Amino acid sequence: MSEFLSIADDVKIGENVKLSKFINLYGCSIGDNTKIGTFVEIQKNATVGKNCKISSHTFICEGVTIEDNVFIGHSVTFINDTYPRATNPDGTLQTEDNWQVEPILIK
């Protein structure tokens, strides 16, 4: 592996996966024949299927599932923000009690 890759021990990488430089992978799963571009981070409990292309400067957070044969364009960011800065109609700041984080599935 390249010195420009950071891959945790618990990452599952399929066959014939192509990894560019400056990639961080933590506790995720990458399917066969998938290509990951430069400056990509994929966090724990995220799954990328087979035959996918994840373009450069992409951030995939915990809980995201990308199925087989999916293209993700440049600079796509999936977020899991437990402290959003949204407000209620009366102007009070919303808290984590106002939000429910759901897994994301991309087909």
Predicted regions and their residues:
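Flexible, glycine/small-residue-enriched loop-and-beta-strand segment within the central core
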Residues: 1-9, 18-107
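Short N-terminal binding/cap micro-motifs at the start of the first secondary-structure element
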Residues: 14-15
